[in-house]
Regions:
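Terminal targeting signals and extreme-terminal segments of soluble enzymes
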Residues: 1-160
Length: 160
């Protein structure tokens, strides 16, 4: 298993600890600002805003991610939630030896969004040696909660 090149560049940048959460987010978005290129997240338009060990924030357009009724598809909300939790988990591991993978994801969709951007904010709820749990709030442009999710990531060994 190898890390995604954009993620690897962001995590292995010299003096990464000195970067602000906004600078880390920009690094995660890649040189073209398109998110982690070639991933589901980039295909559905996820753009990082804030990346730290305790919190990850990103935005995603409703346009292109709708269900047949014209509202944001619940699967797109879940993809946003897992993307945020996974990136946050990567911030808490040794990227030369470990990776984080989502193993459990659940959400309650409380309101539909039909236009604009939604913003997801993942907050680290528990960090252990082999597991991390994140709570994710997804809100519409008016700041109203649309989905509340919880994502659990396992920490696995990579490399030799």
């Amino acid at each position: 298993m190898t890390l995604h090149p954009d993620l690897q560049k962001a995590l292995f940048v010299e003096d990464a600890e000195q970067l602000t959460p906004e600078q880390l987010a920009a690094a995660m978005n890649g040189p073209a600002g398109e998110g982690l290129s070639g991933t589901l997240g980039s295909r559905i338009g996820i753009r990082f805003v804030w990346v730290s060990k305790e919190k990850v924030v990103a935005q995603m357009p409703v346009e292109g991610n709708r269900q047949p009724t014209g509202r944001l598809h619940g699967g797109a909300s879940l993809a946003l939630a897992e993307e945020l939790a996974s990136v946050g988990s990567f911030m808490n591991v040794d990227p030369a030896r470990q990776a984080a993978v989502g193993v459990d994801l659940s959400a309650t969709h409380v309101r539909g969004a039909s236009a604009g951007l939604v913003t997801g904010e993942a907050t680290l709820a528990y960090r252990g040696r082999s597991i991390m749990v994140w709570t994710v709030e997804i809100k519409d442009e008016q700041g109203r909660l649309t989905s509340l999710a919880r994502c659990t990531c396992n920490v696995i060994s990579i490399g030799a």
